[in-house]
């Protein structure tokens, strides 16, 4: 296996297989039983799936199948849209921990108990020291919400003494209340209530600040009033979930004041958030440092340190181990304690310096991006960074709206969300290693978020990636500004032209949306809708074939508007009027061609029927003229030899344009086939006159105007230089003829000297008069 695995394409799978193979050899220590050949009857059944039939497959085949499944969808995706996780050596240690946990679980019970106790105690001690959480216990769980669920069970057991015996009957008389911030993860409170079997009335969402402080932090004064109201109503305030780094903006609640409030009303304080990672740094802000005094906190070390498939950890303080066991925070099964093994291996591999370096690197990346954003005036950070958060949230804001009176402020606000959505998608596609994503904030709207603590260790984000992100942002800002500035002009141009309808779709970030309205008298709505769909599809195809920088599409697949043309982002020199006129002209042409094709089909069908009638009539006339005897094979040949028919055969041609049967007499007379009427020339737009290399829908820039002025000036200088040349002498008779209206020499004739004999020669000689080309050129220029 060791020799065959390195031949695999995926280096990660090959390296993991190699590490597992070496680890198994070291642990087994030559105690593997000799492999005996498997003899016997192979049982096969038709209902058994193919991969399970037979005697099984080797490890290489199974890993090859896993590799194919992992990389099957990557061929359909572009490389820029993929986010490849950076699985380093520390990641291999975490993956190795899962395999070792499975191997250790087969040890004898006494060895397993000692080993799991050592692993669990070491990991818990290390985490409590790293994150400044003294005298704490740890619970390791796969789902990051499971820790909060177990803590809620612990608090219920602590506050309701008869809960173990009476169950939910105890809760009925005095309902528990769980307080959760409005800025917490969506669905967190509902998930806890569903798992605990509590009604949603036990969940109280605490609003954030509206007047003072950050709008993403919990309103402490309002929370105090809510707790007092619940106590007066006979309810039991149970637990408060606070944030040290909200999921959206990364802000930290006032944990110090919240802890005092919880101590006053005997409420359990649970804290979670990305800012808890900064507790491992040497300098920690006071707002985050207050989290060390809380009753429990949840840490997600996997994304923070780039460790795949490691469990989340909930640190908590409680003195009664029996209640912790009843709540599920501790387990008597040694196998359950092996969840900490991947972390136990990874933390030892990284060491204290490696852990601090990864968290510090993420904080430095966010500060670097924040400093660069200050130099970009159109990009704003609507959520002020409180200094303790590594999360950067920014948003594009059009500054020209205040100075430009033609733009509607309400329209710009509605379009800004779509533009920022487009901006976030573009940045994520252009710089996938940056890990930027899009977040919807309640007051600020759609924003772009850079959260390096959750992505940089996994994606391997570097300072160069941040610089590339800023460069892409600078490149996209002019496109956003030009598109937003031309939106109103595009709407006016579309509404000005009959046959086009402007569609208000604020979810589209491009120039705009329009629909081509056909001039049809069709009464059937389904037929009219089908015709419009055909015209729209053909129009989109022709527009995408044009040489232009614009993009045209049919919009979202499940959008509300159908048969529309969605126009993408615009450049500064876009000629909106030419664009709209071109779309209208193309739509009319497609509609007329389709209508002409339908009419031609009907005309041709009628013409064919009429031609069949005429041909049958001609056959009957020929039969009457020639007689019946001439139609008999042998007799007809004899009669034709004795008395040949003198009638000329009548040829016929079918005119597709007119749909009629015509004679071929003119064809035989003129010895050429007539083509009928010449179709009228296709009208060309004045906008079609473009310079060489210039794309469609582009306004002429100042450079092109200056070039035309320079070319005209140089042409005049050339004319003046030609007039300054000495004029050659020529015959006076030619001058008289020219003065009388007879042409002397045109410009075309002067290009090749021609011999013109003079009529009035005193000596009657035929000497030619050869005019000069320069003379004719100068006369024509004058």
UniProtKB/Swiss-Prot annotation:
GO cellular component, one term: intracellular membrane-bounded organelle
Feature: compositional bias, Basic and acidic residues: 26-48
Region feature Disordered, mapped onto this chain: 26-56, 673-695, 702-721, 726-782
Domain of life: Eukaryota
Biased composition (Polar residues): 703-714, 747-782
This protein's UniProt keywords: Decarboxylase, Lyase, Pyridoxal phosphate
EC number: 4.1.1.-
Cofactor: pyridoxal 5'-phosphate
Molecular-function GO terms, alphabetical: carboxy-lyase activity; pyridoxal phosphate binding
Keyword presence, Lyase: yes
Keyword Glycoprotein: no
InterPro entries named in the record: GrpII_AminoAcid_Decarb (IPR050477), PDXDC1-like_2nd (IPR055103), PDXDC1-like_3rd (IPR055102), PyrdxlP-dep_de-COase (IPR002129), PyrdxlP-dep_Trfase (IPR015424), PyrdxlP-dep_Trfase_major (IPR015421)
GO-annotated biological processes: carboxylic acid metabolic process
Annotated family: Belongs to the group II decarboxylase family.
Protein name: Pyridoxal-dependent decarboxylase domain-containing protein 1
Originating organism: Xenopus laevis
Lineage, broadest ranks: Eukaryota, Metazoa, Chordata, Craniata, Vertebrata
């Amino acid at each position: 296996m060791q020799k065959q695995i390195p031949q695999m394409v995926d280096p990660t799978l090959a390296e993991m297989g190699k590490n597992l193979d070496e680890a198994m050899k070291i642990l087994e220590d030559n105690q593997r039983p000799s492999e005996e050949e498997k003899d016997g009857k192979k049982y096969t059944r038709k209902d058994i799936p193919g991969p399970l039939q037979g005697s099984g497959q080797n490890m290489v085949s199974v890993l090859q199948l896993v590799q194919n499944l992992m990389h099957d969808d990557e061929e359909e995706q572009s490389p820029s849209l993929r986010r490849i996780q950076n699985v380093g050596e520390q990641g291999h240690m975490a993956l190795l921990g899962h395999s070792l946990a499975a191997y250790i679980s087969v040890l004898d019970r006494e060895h397993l108990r000692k080993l799991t106790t050592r692993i669990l105690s070491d990991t818990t001690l290390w985490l409590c020291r790293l994150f400044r959480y003294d005298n704490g216990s740890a619970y390791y769980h796969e789902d990051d919400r499971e820790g909060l669920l177990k803590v809620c069970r612990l608090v219920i057991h602590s506050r309701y003494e008869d809960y173990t015996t009476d169950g939910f009957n105890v809760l009925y008389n005095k309902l528990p209340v769980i307080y959760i911030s409005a800025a917490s993860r969506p669905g967190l409170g509902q998930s806890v209530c569903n798992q605990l079997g509590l009604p949603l009335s036990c969940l109280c969402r605490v609003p954030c600040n509206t007047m003072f402080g950050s709008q993403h932090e919990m309103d402490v004064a309002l929370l105090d009033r809510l707790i007092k109201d619940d106590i007066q109503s006979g309810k039991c305030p149970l637990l408060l979930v606070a944030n040290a780094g909200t999921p959206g903006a990364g802000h930290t609640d006032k944990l110090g004041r919240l802890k005092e409030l919880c101590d006053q009303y005997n409420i359990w304080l649970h804290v979670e958030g990305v800012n808890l990672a900064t507790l491992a740094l040497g300098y920690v802000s006071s707002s985050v440092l207050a989290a060390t005094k809380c009753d429990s906190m949840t840490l997600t070390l996997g994304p923070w340190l780039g460790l795949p498939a490691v469990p989340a950890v909930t640190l908590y303080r409680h003195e009664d181990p029996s209640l912790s066991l009843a709540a599920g925070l501790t387990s008597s099964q040694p196998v359950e304690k092996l969840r900490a093994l991947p972390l136990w291996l990874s933390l030892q591999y990284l060491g204290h310096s490696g852990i601090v370096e990864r968290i510090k690197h993420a904080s430095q990346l966010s500060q670097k991006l924040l400093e660069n954003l200050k130099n970009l005036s159109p990009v704003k950070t609507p959520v002020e960074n409180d200094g303790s958060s590594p999360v950067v949230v920014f948003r594009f804001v059009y500054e020209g709206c205040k100075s430009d009176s033609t733009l509607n402020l309400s329209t710009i606000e509605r379009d800004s969300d779509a533009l920022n959505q487009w901006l976030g998608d573009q940045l994520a596609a252009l710089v996938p290693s940056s890990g930027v994503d899009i977040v919807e904030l309640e007051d600020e709207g759609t924003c772009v978020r850079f959260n390096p603590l959750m992505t940089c260790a996994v994606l391997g984000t570097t300072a160069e990636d941040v610089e590339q992100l800023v460069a892409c942002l600078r490149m996209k800002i002019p496109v956003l500004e030009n598109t937003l500035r031309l939106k109103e002009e595009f709407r006016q141009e579309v509404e000005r032209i009959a046959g086009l309808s402007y569609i208000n779709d604020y979810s589209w970030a491009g120039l705009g949306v329009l629909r081509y309205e056909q001039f049809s008298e069709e009464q059937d709505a389904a037929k009219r809708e089908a015709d419009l769909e055909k015209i729209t599809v053909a129009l989109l195809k022709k527009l995408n074939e044009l040489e232009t920088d614009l993009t045209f599409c049919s919009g979202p697949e499940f959008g509300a508007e159908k048969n529309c043309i969605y126009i993408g982002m615009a450049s500064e020199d876009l000629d909106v009027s030419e664009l709209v006129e071109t779309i209208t002209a193309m739509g009319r042409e497609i509609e007329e061609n389709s209508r002409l094709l339908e009419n031609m089909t009907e005309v041709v069908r009628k013409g064919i029927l009429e031609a069949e009638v005429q041909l049958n009539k001609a056959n009957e006339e020929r039969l009457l003229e020639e007689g019946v005897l001439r139609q008999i094979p042998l007799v007809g040949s004899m009669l034709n030899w004795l008395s040949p028919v003198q009638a000329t055969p009548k040829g016929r041609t079918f005119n597709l344009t007119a749909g009629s049967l015509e004679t071929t007499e003119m064809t035989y007379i003129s010895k050429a086939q007539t083509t009928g009427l010449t179709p009228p020339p296709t009208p060309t737009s004045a906008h079609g006159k473009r310079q060489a290399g210039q794309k469609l829908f582009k306004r002429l820039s100042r450079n092109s105007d200056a070039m035309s002025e320079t070319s005209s000036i140089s042409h005049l200088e050339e004319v003046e230089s030609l007039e300054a040349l000495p004029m050659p002498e020529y015959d006076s008779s030619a001058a008289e003829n020219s003065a009388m209206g007879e042409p002397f020499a045109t410009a075309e004739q002067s290009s090749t000297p021609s011999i013109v004999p003079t009529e009035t020669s005193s000596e009657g000689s035929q000497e030619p008069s050869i005019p000069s080309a320069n003379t004719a050129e100068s006369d024509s220029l004058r």
